[in-house]
Curated annotation (Swiss-Prot):
Protein name: LysM domain-containing protein ARB_01155/01156
Organism lineage: Eukaryota, Fungi, Dikarya, Ascomycota, Pezizomycotina
Limits of the LysM domain: 373-419
Domain of life of the source: Eukaryota
UniProt-annotated location(s): Secreted
Region span, LysM domain: 375-405
Main localization category: secreted
Notes on the domains: The LysM domain binds chitin and potentially related carbohydrates, and might be involved in damping host defense.
Presence of the UniProt keyword Glycoprotein in the record: yes
Residues the record marks as carrying a glycan: 46, 71, 283
Record keywords: Chitin-binding, Glycoprotein, Secreted, Signal, Virulence
Organism, scientific name: Arthroderma benhamiae (strain ATCC MYA-4681 / CBS 112371) (Trichophyton mentagrophytes)
Any one GO cellular component localisation term in the record: extracellular region
S-S bridge residues: none
Length: 573
């Protein structure tokens, strides 16, 4: 990613870089292997382009930067325009319709020069003596009135707006009139030559996907021409430069010899990594031989290392991208063998979300409301690329967003789609028996979920004695309930399990939860606020029979049964 301040500071530079060469002096054969194409295709992609390198690279993502007059005039030369056209033609001739694989995405090789050419055409639009890109940076449209994102967040009529409880109300919906371009901009601006040219140029993009968003743009442009009493010819792209995600093709023929490895292996990836990615990931250099790797990594003797990997010649170079290397043989090598440790489970998968997320953008009918994570679609996205990014299948993505057709032709840019459902997990419970305290026998208390991580000490007050309830309590992602159990002179509790001791608390109608207690720090709960990431609470000083009422902005409230009383979070120091 180019630094954001690059373009705004370009006018300060006393020189320009007169040539663009995207791969520089990298080895063509290595690049061809990594992109799964020919060296002739890579040579065409890597040819020198007669454009200022800094502004040309920035033009490939033109909307990311603020353009000055010096930036635009440096880029927009006739030599650069001709060179970009020649570059695109050369890649078409050398690569044809043969796809390349880059970062797991299968696409036409021509998509690379087209990215730069599209940016050049947009930045270099003119109306008379004016540069439209510079003008467009000052355009302002009308504000669209929308409800705050937390307008309906609690589900409580006391706090949420009355509209939240009306059937069919959608706080993120946009009024039909607000979707019209003619309603968002003043007529003098919308009908100006630059405005129409820029909008038309967007429609000419080779990366504009077929589907609902493109149809929306075409509809708006036709509406604008009618509104402005003008006519401008245009045609949307018919080519598809993105073909989807790479799939692994299994080789035919005899399987390789079966070997057993007692140590870690370098496993092939799907899609396969390029040579550069492999060397970066495993800290080896291109051209390393098996003998080199043995000396660097293996604990086994060289004959055992070669045998474990079915290698005939120790100095044979490693040329196959999908070749797995065994570091240690099956027998116990000198110095001992490596024993892999079990993985530590941490909720990172798409299904491990325990609360409903708030969409970052409008959603359309068909997206499941029980969604743990949303993704806002941007230009160039497809169903399979979104699924690949979030580690789910396309079928799973479509099941979470049933309005999307099988061809993924109605994916809308700037709309939010669900990529992970809310996962409901039944937490196992354990029973903890409490020892006898000095002033009474404490009854068994139903306690916490099985520990996941961390360590915290919880205490209860029995008469005037502080008794440790559970030494190995755990930090968890969920909330346990609270129940009152009678003891001779004290209270036994089933405590809430929280992710972290924090700063906010929401309590209502404690119903005299603090019975027979003194003025001591205590936590008084009747409802628990579930936030998107963590639940946060802090101890407060309460009096017998008192209830604390404080609204925390934005949480979703889930009622839980409350049967008890006092929780002391290790406050006696």
């Amino acid at each position: 990613m180019i630094p954001r301040n690059l373009i705004s500071g370009l006018f300060l530079l006393p020189f320009v870089v007169a040539e663009l060469n995207i791969y520089g002096y990298l080895d063509l054969k290595t690049l061809a292997d990594g992109f799964h194409t020919t060296t002739a295709c890579i040579a065409a992609l890597n040819q020198t382009v007669d454009c200022d390198a800094r502004t040309a690279v920035a033009a490939a993502v033109a909307d990311t930067y603020y353009w000055t007059l010096d930036n635009v005039t440096t880029l927009c030369t006739s030599q650069c325009q001709q060179s970009l056209t020649s570059w695109t033609s050369a890649v078409d001739a050398a690569c044809g319709n043969r796809p390349i694989v880059e970062d797991g995405i299968v696409k036409l090789a021509s998509s690379t020069p087209l990215t730069y050419k599209e940016g050049f055409d947009l930045v270099c639009l003119k109306s008379g003596d004016s540069w439209c890109m510079i003008e467009s940076q000052e355009w302002e449209g009308s504000d669209i009135l929308k409800y705050p994102t937390d307008y309906c967040s609690t589900g409580d009529p006391e706090y949420d707006g009355p509209e939240c409880f009306e059937k069919g109300f959608d706080q993120l919906a946009i009024e039909a009139g607000d979707e019209r371009m003619t309603s968002l901009y003043e007529k003098d601006l919308l009908c100006s030559d630059c405005f129409l040219k820029v909008f038309r140029q967007r429609l000419l993009s080779p990366f504009l996907l077929k589907g609902g968003y493109t149809s929306y743009l075409v509809e708006q442009f036709q509406d604008m021409q009618s509104y402005c009493s003008t006519s401008m010819p245009y045609a949307t792209s018919t080519s598809e430069v993105f073909m989807g995600t790479a799939t692994r093709t299994m080789p035919t023929g005899s399987p390789p010899p079966t070997t057993t490895c007692g140590g870690p292996t370098i496993q092939p990836t799907d899609p396969p990594l390029s040579c550069e990615a492999i060397t970066d990931k495993y800290n080896v250099t291109t051209g390393d031989s098996h003998s080199d790797l043995h000396g660097e990594f293996s604990l086994a003797s060289k004959p055992r290392f070669l045998k474990a990997n079915a290698i005939d010649r120790q100095h044979e170079p490693i040329e196959k991208l999908d070749h797995a290397i065994c570091y240690a043989g099956t027998s116990e090598p000198p110095g001992g063998s490596y024993e892999s440790q079990p993985p530590v489970h941490q909720p990172t998968g798409a299904s491990e979300y325990y609360t409903t997320a708030i969409p970052p953008a409008p959603t359309s009918t068909g997206t499941t409301p029980s969604c743990g994570r949303y993704y806002e679609v941007v230009a160039g996205d497809q169903c399979n690329t979104i699924a690949l990014h979030f580690g789910i299948t396309v079928d799973a993505f479509l099941s979470l967003n049933t309005q999307i057709d099988e061809r993924c032709s109605n994916l809308w840019i700037a709309y939010a789609y669900c990529v992970a459902p809310v996962d409901i997990v039944d937490q196992p419970m354990t029973i903890v028996d409490q020892d006898i305290a000095t002033q009474g026998n404490v009854l068994p208390a139903t306690e916490l979920p099985s520990p996941r991580m961390g360590r915290v000490v919880l205490n209860i007050m029995i008469g005037s004695v502080v008794t440790q309830l559970l030494e190995n309590a755990a930090l968890s992602m969920d909330i346990a309930g609270v129940r009152r159990t009678s003891a001779q002179q004290g209270i036994v509790i089933r405590v809430p399990v929280i992710q972290t001791l924090a700063k906010r608390v929401l309590t209502v109608r404690a119903d005299q939860a603090l019975q027979e207690t003194k003025h001591v720090p205590a936590l008084n709960l009747a409802h628990v606020a579930t936030w998107r990431d963590i639940v946060e609470m802090e101890p407060t000083t309460a009096h017998p029979g008192d209830a604390i009422l404080e609204r925390a902005k934005g949480p979703r409230i889930h009622s839980i049964a409350l049967y008890v009383t006092v929780l002391y979070l290790d406050l006696w120091i």
